[in-house]
């Protein structure tokens, strides 16, 4: 229908400051430039009202149906998270994880979470109470108190789409969706505090979806560590950023839903790990399957993996196994996650493995900016005398790995700079800002298109397949030296059957354990306080795991404390004076 002319109204538009008015079929003024609707209505005569009464009623009924279609489904926040969890599980299946991770593991954890939070599978769902807390529109009406239970209305079709039974909701009612949120409980979910039961422990969020995935991987003992999981998230192989794009078109996001499902920061290693342990305790899960010796998460297996990743000799694996045995880090009771034991230390399997490697390197090379270079000079002389069997040289390894590490670090920083946070679909917090955001998005796309033409098309290298290794040292037709098969004869005592190191010096990162209740030593790491060789190795492994330096350094301190505890105990006993006998 054509809009009537509104040139008789000469007040500028409050949005675009232009005078270009028209009158809609409902009799309201709107700006033809920016489509802003104002409260002013057309003044009509009584006779005209009676003549067009039937026409107005017909038009209003049609507009009401159109609004309901634009609004989409009446959905809950937990439904949105369930769609995202399904897509994340399917992505993990595509990466090679066992098929039961979706239907048996994550689905079971999710049902238990819904039951523990009284959202489903209970007699009285929590939504009957949260609906009363929702801020509704002035034209909205309350839902019927006798609505069917949420758990009874959950159905999953062939495409794993969850739907909620809403037969008892009136077709013309607009009360289920607040003007501040596209979902039914978006406002109440955002305002809900941790002290309010049953949300006192775990509140669902996007980082919590990764906690679900990590618990499922840990239950299956899959060949994906937490650092690998976060790296796949950054590479967008697992839905996390702009995950709302995977939701059905009938689920509309705006208002508080944008704050719930839109992520503007990268997930942090320790944060996801703490959430996973917190979730396991909250769900009262049973003891997880044991981490046995041939399991991927066992320190002996992970140490071999990261020795290959760092281009270190294979003979170091024998030393890492000995240190793991002496420190007890290979104990299956300590490695296995038991949610019932709430005081157990959080096991960082990948960080613990690289910390074992660093401790072994300190035992053999000292890493004090002096001993390792002297041993490297001695190894170079041995290689000059006998060129058949290569002997490991620390200096040659340092130069080879450093050049590759710096290139990879620069490439990663460029990827961080090119990372796109904006989604293809438009997200808005209110209907009044929708037109403004649409204009901004259109201008941004036009500018991006123009700059792309000026800069020229970038060469498309293609997206590489997923891999657990960042560096491939054994590739042919490269100038890189592979040190995997090199010998450690230059740093070991000749003739000793139990191999002993030539180096007899070792410096400790920390001599005393901090007993303060609020300890921040694990979050502090000053580069100037440590030798450059040690800092380079910590930086290398921190880059491989995509964690901060303090995380790796703190794990090294914990292993050193356990490793030298027996030695320090014997030394203290020798210093004690014998008691005098009467």
UniProtKB/Swiss-Prot annotation:
Q: What's one Pfam family the UniProt record gives for this protein?
A: Rrn7_cyclin_N
- Binding locations of Zn(2+): 13, 16, 31, 34
Family statement drawn from the similarity comment of this UniProt entry:
Belongs to the RRN7/TAF1B family.
Q: Where is this region: N-terminal cyclin fold?
A: 75-256
Q: Which InterPro entries match?
A: Rrn7_cyclin_C, Rrn7_cyclin_N, TAF1B/Rrn7, TF_Rrn7_Zf
Cellular component GO terms held in the UniProt record: RNA polymerase I core factor complex; RNA polymerase transcription factor SL1 complex
**What's the domain remark here?**
Although it shares weak sequence similarity with GTF2B/TFIIB, displays a similar subdomain organization as GTF2B/TFIIB, with a N-terminal zinc finger, a connecting region (composed of B-reader and B-linker regions), followed by 2 cyclin folds. The RRN7-type zinc finger plays an essential postrecruitment role in Pol I transcription at a step preceding synthesis of the first 40 nucleotides.
Zinc finger regions, RRN7-type: 4-39
Region annotation (C-terminal cyclin fold) maps to 257-367
Localization annotation: Nucleus, Nucleolus
Gene Ontology BP term (one): nucleolar large rRNA transcription by RNA polymerase I
Q: Looking at the record, which segments are called B-reader?
A: 40-69
**What UniProt keywords are attached to this protein's entry?**
DNA-binding, Metal-binding, Nucleus, Transcription, Transcription regulation, Zinc, Zinc-finger
Stretches the record annotates as B-linker: 70-74
| GO molecular function terms listed in the Swiss-Prot or TrEMBL record | RNA polymerase I core promoter sequence-specific DNA binding; zinc ion binding
What functional role does this protein have?
Answer: Component of RNA polymerase I core factor complex that acts as a GTF2B/TFIIB-like factor and plays a key role in multiple steps during transcription initiation such as pre-initiation complex (PIC) assembly and postpolymerase recruitment events in polymerase I (Pol I) transcription. Binds rDNA promoters and plays a role in Pol I recruitment.
User: What is this protein called in UniProt?
Assistant: TATA box-binding protein-associated factor RNA polymerase I subunit B
């Amino acid at each position: 229908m054509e809009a009537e002319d509104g040139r008789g109204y000469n007040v500028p538009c409050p949005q675009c400051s232009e005078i270009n008015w028209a009158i809609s079929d409902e009799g309201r003024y709107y700006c033809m430039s920016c489509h802003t609707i104002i409260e002013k209505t057309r003044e009509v005569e009584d006779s005209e009202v009676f003549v067009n009464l039937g026409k107005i009623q017909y038009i209003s009924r049609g507009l009401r149906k159109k609004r309901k279609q634009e609004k989409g489904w009446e959905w809950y926040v937990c439904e949105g998270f369930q769609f995202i969890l399904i897509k994340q599980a399917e992505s993990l299946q595509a990466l090679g994880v066992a098929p039961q991770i979706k239907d048996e593991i994550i689905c079971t954890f999710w049902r238990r979470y819904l039951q523990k939070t009284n959202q489903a599978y209970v007699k009285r769902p929590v939504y009957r109470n949260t609906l009363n807390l929702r801020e509704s529109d002035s034209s909205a009406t309350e839902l019927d108190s006798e609505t069917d239970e949420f758990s009874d209305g959950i159905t999953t079709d062939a495409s794993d789409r969850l739907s909620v039974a809403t037969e008892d909701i009136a077709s013309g009612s607009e009360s289920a969706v607040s003007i501040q949120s596209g979902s039914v409980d978006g406002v109440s979910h955002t305002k809900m505090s941790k002290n309010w039961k049953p949300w006192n422990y775990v509140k669902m969020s996007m980082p919590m979806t990764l906690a679900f995935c990590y618990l499922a991987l840990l239950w299956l003992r899959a060949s994906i560590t937490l650092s690998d999981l976060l790296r796949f998230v950054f590479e967008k192989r697992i839905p996390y950023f702009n995950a709302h794009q995977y939701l059905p078109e009938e689920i509309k996001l705006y208002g508080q839903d944008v704050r719930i499902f839109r992520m503007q920061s990268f997930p942090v290693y320790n944060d996801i790990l703490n959430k996973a342990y917190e979730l396991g305790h909250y769900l009262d899960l049973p003891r997880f399957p044991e981490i046995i010796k041939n399991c991927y998460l066992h320190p002996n297996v992970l140490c071999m993996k990261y020795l290959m990743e760092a281009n270190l000799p294979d003979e170091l694996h024998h030393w890492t196994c000995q240190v793991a045995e002496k420190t007890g880090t290979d104990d299956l009771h300590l490695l296995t996650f038991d949610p019932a034991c709430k005081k157990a230390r959080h096991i960082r399997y990948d960080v613990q493995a690289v910390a074992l490697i660093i401790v072994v390197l300190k035992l053999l090379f000292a890493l004090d900016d002096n001993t390792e270079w002297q041993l490297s000079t001695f190894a170079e002389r041995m290689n000059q005398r006998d060129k058949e069997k290569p002997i490991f040289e620390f200096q040659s390894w340092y130069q080879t790995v450093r050049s590759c590490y710096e290139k990879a670090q620069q490439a990663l920083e460029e990827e961080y700079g090119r990372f796109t946070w904006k989604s293809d679909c438009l997200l808005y917090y209110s209907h009044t800002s929708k037109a403004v955001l649409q204009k901004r998005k259109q201008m941004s796309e036009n500018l991006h298109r123009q700059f792309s033409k000026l800069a020229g098309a970038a060469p498309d290298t293609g997206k590489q397949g997923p891999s657990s290794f960042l560096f491939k040292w054994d590739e042919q037709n490269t100038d890189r030296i592979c040190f995997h098969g090199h010998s450690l004869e230059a740093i070991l005592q000749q003739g000793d059957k139990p191999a002993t190191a030539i180096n007899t010096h070792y410096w400790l990162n920390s001599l005393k354990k901090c007993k303060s209740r609020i300890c921040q030593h694990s979050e502090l790491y000053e580069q100037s306080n440590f030798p450059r060789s040690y800092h380079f190795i910590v930086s290398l492994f921190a880059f491989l795991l995509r964690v901060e330096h303090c995380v790796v350094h703190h794990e090294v301190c914990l292993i050193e404390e356990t490793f030298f505890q027996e030695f320090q105990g014997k030394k203290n006993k020798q210093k004690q004076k014998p008691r005098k006998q009467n």
